[in-house]
Amino acid sequence: MWRTLSAPEQDLVAARIDSQDPFNKYGTHAGEICESELPFYPGARLLRVTNRTPAVGSRYFIQRGDDLVPLHRLPEVQSFCDDRFGLVLDSRTAADYFRFAHYFSREGESTSLVEAPHDLRIDSSSSPERRQAIAFIEPLEITRDKDGVTVTACTFDEPRSRLYRDCYRLTPGQPLELLSREDSGVNLDSSFHDRLLQIGRPDLPVPHHIAASTE
C-alpha cells in the first residue's frame, strides 16, 4: 500500500534523488512522493515521485539504506532488482512480486492488471456486455515451484479496449514471459483504469490458488 511521505521526509528523499541526478531534478520538481514496502525485497521500499507537471508523469525508485536505484533507467527492472536486492519468493510475497514484475515489464507497458471488476469501475448494474466482463474477470491464480511461479491474470489493453486472461511465467532473474492469451471478446470502450501499481491489495482476498511443487 502507498503512504504519502511527510514534508520533512519528502525533502530528504528529494535531496537524495537530486544529489544522484542533478540534471533532471526529479526531487525538486516533485509534487508528491509516496512509498510502499516491497516484501519480496527485504528492507527495500519503492518510491513513487509524481512530477508537478502532469505530462512528465511519475518516476519510480527503489531505496534500501544508501542504495537508490532509478527504475526508469533500467532496461529490465525486475531481473535487475532480483539480483541487486535479493529476492524472497514464497506464498506471502508471490502475488506482489508478480504485480511488480508485470508493471515494469514490456507487457505492463501495454496492459494493466485487472484483479476485480472495480479495477475497471464496472458494477453489476452495467450493460450485458459489461456483465459478461464481470463474469470473465478472475483473481490471480499462482502456481509456485522450485524455479519460480506461473500466474494466470486478467489484463486490460486500454488502447484496444480489450479484456484478456493471460498466463505468465515468472522466473527470478529473468524477464516476465507471456505464455498464452485468451480474449474475452468483450469491447470495453469506455472503461477506465488508472494504471497505478498496487503492492498489497487489502481490498481483495489472498489469491485463491497458490500451490508449491513437492518435486
Named regions from a protein language model:
Residues 117-156:
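Extended beta-strand-rich segments in extracellular/periplasmic secretory proteins, especially
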Residues 44-46, 146-150, 173:
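A generic structural signal for beta-strand entry/edge sites
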Residues 191-215:
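Compositionally biased, intrinsically disordered linkers/stalks adjacent to structured regions
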Residues 1-133:
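Extended, low-hydrophobicity segments enriched in charged/polar residues
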Residues 140, 166-169:
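Hydrophobic/aromatic beta-strand elements that line small-molecule binding cavities or substrate pockets
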Residues 171-181:
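Short beta-strand edge/turn micro-motifs at domain boundaries
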Residues 56-57, 135, 160-166:
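Short, surface-exposed coil-to-beta transition loops
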Residues 158, 180-193:
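Short, solvent-exposed aromatic-acidic interface loops
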